Amino acid sequence: MALTLYPAIDLKDGACVRLRRGEMDQATVYAEDPAAQARTFEAAGFTALHVVDLNGAFAGRPVNGEAVRAILTAVAMPVQLGGGIRDMAGIAAWIELGISRVILGSAAVKNPALVREAAAAFPGRIIVGIDARDGMVATEGWAETSSLPATEMAMRLQDAGIAAIIHTDIARDGMLQGLNLDATEALAAAIAIPVIASGGVAGIEDIRNLRAAAARTPNLAGTIIGRALYDGRIDPQAALAEAAAC
């Protein structure tokens, strides 16, 4: 089965940025107009978009709503959104506005009942982001690290009814060091839920390696690509062709 590639738009103060290891003071601005960037990704052939409200992740509430709404207006492809979404009202509001899938991160750790409630209310629309630092789950925009192993959290979510898990290796995020495929594949092998790899994609080889891993672990469903696209290290057409190869 083909992998899904999700170009990433991370929003900080209304602009499209990339961070290094989630550090807000290590932000590089790549586009002042996130909606235009979303259109560029869609025109390149991508079929889904990953958007994170970085300010929202730290504030615990949506902050870049205007930019998200502009993205939704600009593109027809499905958009998944995370960052600062912490309750049913927020989830429902974004889905009503046209968000395809809502990503719960800190809320999933601190309020597991919310995940089950949301997944029951919005089947196929809820994703959980498991962000790991040295194998342990991090929350609050990665500012806090828990004592909960990422794989254990994934196993707890096995029967929650969610659509997918995004597994991010914080140490590699934005660093162009390659996916931590060992950790991601181990997590995926422990569950049946589709798993999306994130953090560190540096080149076409990462997609090739992920495809090989998916042959062994079929619920590896795709990957999120950020800095490598913005820096021109990955050609979109080549990446999409590699992801679709059997």
From Swiss-Prot:
It holds the Pfam family His_biosynth. Keywords: Amino-acid biosynthesis, Cytoplasm, Histidine biosynthesis, Isomerase. Its EC number is 5.3.1.16. It is found in: Cytoplasm. It catalyses: 1-(5-phospho-beta-D-ribosyl)-5-[(5-phospho-beta-D-ribosylamino)methylideneamino]imidazole-4-carboxamide = 5-[(5-phospho-1-deoxy-D-ribulos-1-ylimino)methylamino]-1-(5-phospho-beta-D-ribosyl)imidazole-4-carboxamide. GO terms for biological process: L-histidine biosynthetic process; L-tryptophan biosynthetic process. The keyword Amino-acid biosynthesis applies. Gene3D superfamilies: Aldolase class I (3.20.20.70). InterPro entries: Aldolase_TIM, His_biosynth, HisA_bact_arch, Isoase_HisA-like, Isoase_HisA-like_bact, RibuloseP-bd_barrel. GO terms for molecular function: 1-(5-phosphoribosyl)-5-[(5-phosphoribosylamino)methylideneamino]imidazole-4-carboxamide isomerase activity. The active site is at D10 (proton acceptor), D131 (proton donor). GO terms for cellular component: cytoplasm. Pathway: Amino-acid biosynthesis; L-histidine biosynthesis; L-histidine from 5-phospho-alpha-D-ribose 1-diphosphate: step 4/9. The keyword Phosphoprotein does not apply. CDD domains: HisA. Belongs to the HisA/HisF family. This is 1-(5-phosphoribosyl)-5-[(5-phosphoribosylamino)methylideneamino] imidazole-4-carboxamide isomerase. It comes from Acidiphilium cryptum (strain JF-5).
